[in-house]
A protein has these predicted regions:
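Sec/Tat signal peptide C-region and signal peptidase I cleavage site
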Residues: 8-12
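A contiguous strand-loop segment
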Residues: 14-137, 157-307, 314, 318
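Short, well-ordered beta-strand elements within core beta-sheets of diverse protein domains
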Residues: 141-147
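Short, charged, surface-exposed loops that flank catalytic or proteolytic processing sites
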Residues: 147-153
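Glycine-rich, aromatic-lined ligand/substrate-binding cores of catalytic
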Residues: 240-390, 394, 398
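Substrate-recognition/cap regions that form aromatic- and gly/pro-loop-enriched pockets
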Residues: 346-483
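Histidine-centered catalytic/metal-binding microenvironments
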Residues: 464-528
């Protein structure tokens, strides 16, 4: 198959590329097949910001030799598939003969071959951004998912396309998984005089887990080990010419694209790695953290979903640990007794205004220290993708999808062989309030529960875990039925069955969150 075209057409229009605020960025956790309980390769992402929540199951397709692929800027912030307000045609590249079906999301995440990608923005040096380049990271993801079957193919293609046609985005990281391998891909622009790209992909050991949380992480690159490292053309020479590497010290990619003065990890990187491998005794004082670690015990799907819900509650980084109140109560004998407990208003998703208000009431030498939690209320969507080589692709690949705050919303299965999604998943709720968008069904209930989280969580958390258990209980039976249909040669029936199951699961969560919203209004009707 031809993966790269030979020509492109670039529109005259250009737009200033704005670097993402890391506070409104993403977290990706991934695990190799020998690091997981069941042998699946896992990747994940929280899309924290205003990227579109509308999605589309794009079907596989054959194309004529003359076909082109138009590349548009800013589809990631549209309201639906047909919304073209503010969208700019940047250029086009030749199409290939056949494209795979894939799940088109804000950052496209899985195809029919069980190739999956988690994304995080890593920003990097501002001076490396070149708006003359053609591709944003989501464009490269879409093309790779349509054209590739393996993670190695995908990183090679994305790197080659970015070098050939230009990369206009800020620094980005993709955790790219297939049924067998996991790759960590970091890319940035090549500077104002070169619309190309600087990139490195490092293979994660099969028995390791890794994390990316908005800062470059790839350290020393072994240019002689092509099994573990793939790089852009002339990377060392370009880094030296730009003054980012002296040619003598070890070539650390994070230093090249982010500067030695910036730490190559965040609290989220540390928290995930330390949770997975506490025996390593990692600390936040280290100059670097390992890119990946061997977990102390095999990682389950629920370990990853639990980490995506994480607010550090119960740890030294818990922002609510001192939010205690004392109330004088009478016991059964009428004796008064002081009782101290955490305020039901305490929660780790405080706005800046709330945090400032609370700190104004506290001693100046004991402020609440703001922490960037993994779970945030400004999350657009999140997912955990499983790639499983012992199952046919249609059912082996599954994205456990969630909209709004991953600490409050349920996860629903979207299969690699699925052919459609509900209508409420086809519209985005970011530009204005849309009751027909699934995002707002979850968001209304979640925000209401947060007002008095000590009470609201008593509804939300059991519901989240209930649907997680529902998936664990039902998926083996679903897989068995789908595999049986596929063995009988009934591919379309199998895909229709998976699609119906996904729809039913989604509808059950939507109904549950609507019912909980009503219950919360009843509970808080006379005050929070």
């Amino acid at each position: 198959m031809t993966l790269l075209g030979m020509t492109s057409v670039v529109a005259a229009q250009e737009r200033v590329v704005e670097l993402t605020n890391p506070e409104e960025s993403c977290t990706s956790i991934a695990a190799g097949r020998k690091a997981t309980v069941d042998g699946s390769v896992i990747t994940s992402a929280t899309c924290d910001g205003t990227s579109r929540t509308w999605m589309e199951m794009v079907p596989a397709q054959d194309w004529p030799d003359t076909a082109k692929v138009d590349i548009y800027w800013d589809i990631r912030h549209t309201e639906s598939k047909n919304d073209r307000l503010g969208v700019i045609l940047k250029g086009s590249v030749p199409q290939v003969a056949h494209t795979h079906a894939f799940l088109s999301t804000g950052y496209p995440c899985m195809n029919e071959k069980q190739l999956a990608m988690g994304e995080t923005t890593i920003v990097g040096r501002k001076e490396l951004v070149n708006p003359k380049g053609m591709f944003h990271i989501e464009d490269l993801q879409a093309l790779a998912l349509q054209r590739c079957s393996t993670a190695r193919e995908a990183v090679q293609l994305m790197g080659a396309l970015a070098e050939k046609y230009g990369y206009c985005d800020g620094g980005e990281c993709l955790t790219v998984a297939d049924k067998h391998e996991l790759w960590f891909f970091e890319i940035t622009g090549a500077g104002p005089d070169d619309p190309s790209a600087l990139w490195v992909a490092q293979r994660i050991p099969d028995d390791h887990v890794t994390v990316s949380a908005n800062t470059p992480r790839i350290s020393t690159v072994d240019f002689d080990d092509r099994e573990r490292f793939l790089t852009s053309t002339g990377l060392r020479e370009k880094a030296r010419r730009l003054g980012y590497w002296d040619g003598k010290e070890p070539f650390k990619f994070w230093k090249v694209i982010n500067g030695a003065e910036n730490k190559p990890y965040t609290i989220r990187d540390f928290f995930v790695l330390n949770t997975m491998a506490p025996s390593l005794k990692l600390t936040m004082d280290m100059d670097e953290l390992p890119l990946s670690v061997k977990p102390d015990r095999p990682v389950a799907l629920t370990d990853v979903t639990r980490l995506l819900r994480e607010t550090y509650e119960g740890t030294e980084y818990d922002m609510t640990k001192d939010m205690m109140v004392t109330e004088t109560l009478k016991d059964e004998n009428g004796a008064e007794r002081d009782t101290t407990y955490k305020s039901p208003l305490a929660q780790n998703w405080m706005t800046k205004d709330m945090l400032n208000f609370l700190n104004a009431q506290r001693p100046q030498d004991k402020p609440i220290q703001k922490q960037r939690t993994i779970s945030v209320v400004w999350c657009a969507y999140s997912f955990v993708a499983q790639c499983r080589d012992w199952l046919p692709d249609a059912v082996g690949g599954v994205c456990w999808w969630s909209e709004d705050n991953p600490g409050e919303s349920p996860r629903v299965p979207l299969f690699a062989g699925q052919t459609d999604v509900p209508e409420s998943f086809k519209v985005c709720g970011h530009k204005h309030y849309r009751p027909d968008a699934a995002l707002w069904t979850y968001r209304r209930t979640n925000r209401l529960a947060q007002v008095s989280w000590g009470h609201g969580r008593q509804l939300i958390e059991p519901a989240v875990l209930s649907f997680e258990q529902k998936g664990a209980d039902e998926l083996p039976l679903v897989e068995q039925k789908a595999v049986a249909l596929l063995k009988e040669g009934k591919e379309q029936e199998a895909k229709a069955y998976l699609t119906r199951y996904s729809f039913d699961f989604i509808y059950a969560t939507l109904r549950c969150w609507q019912e909980m919203e009503a219950e919360l209004w009843h509970k808080f009707g006379r005050g929070f």
